[in-house]
């Protein structure tokens, strides 16, 4: 049986832009994409800490420090909002004991503070 498991997240990123007239997506600093092993056009869930909005979109590479919501998503976040960007993967149950997500922690300028591979939580059955 496969389970949907957190694959990677960028924790408490600060929204730097909202472009309603762009064709959808979220622009993310390429350094953050690399740290979390995100790929262009990957589906991500966005959790807005400021207002509780939760929605899905896809990733495109952005400029250094950039976290910009594009298209319809621009209505759900404002510059200055704090968000969590999460990606999930289907993992076979027998692989869960070895699976570890990428956890990317950033400061208020979206600079990487730390990247962790979660070893604290172990799957037990």
Curated annotation (Swiss-Prot):
The modification Pyruvic acid (Ser) is found at residue 25. Belongs to the PanD family. InterPro entries: Asp_de-COase-like_dom_sf (IPR009010), Asp_decarbox (IPR003190). It holds the Pfam family Asp_decarbox. Heterooctamer of four alpha and four beta subunits. Its cofactor is pyruvate. Substrate binds at residues 57, 71-73. Its EC number is 4.1.1.11. PANTHER family: ASPARTATE 1-DECARBOXYLASE. This is Aspartate 1-decarboxylase. It catalyses: L-aspartate + H(+) = beta-alanine + CO2. Pathway: Cofactor biosynthesis; (R)-pantothenate biosynthesis; beta-alanine from L-aspartate: step 1/1. The lineage of its organism: Bacteria, Pseudomonadati, Aquificota, Aquificia, Aquificales. It is found in: Cytoplasm. Is synthesized initially as an inactive proenzyme, which is activated by self-cleavage at a specific serine bond to produce a beta-subunit with a hydroxyl group at its C-terminus and an alpha-subunit with a pyruvoyl group at its N-terminus. One of its GO terms (cellular component) is cytosol. One of its GO terms (biological process) is pantothenate biosynthetic process. The active site is at 25 (schiff-base intermediate with substrate), 58 (proton donor). One of its GO terms (molecular function) is aspartate 1-decarboxylase activity. Keywords: Autocatalytic cleavage, Cytoplasm, Decarboxylase, Lyase, Pantothenate biosynthesis, Pyruvate, Schiff base, Zymogen.
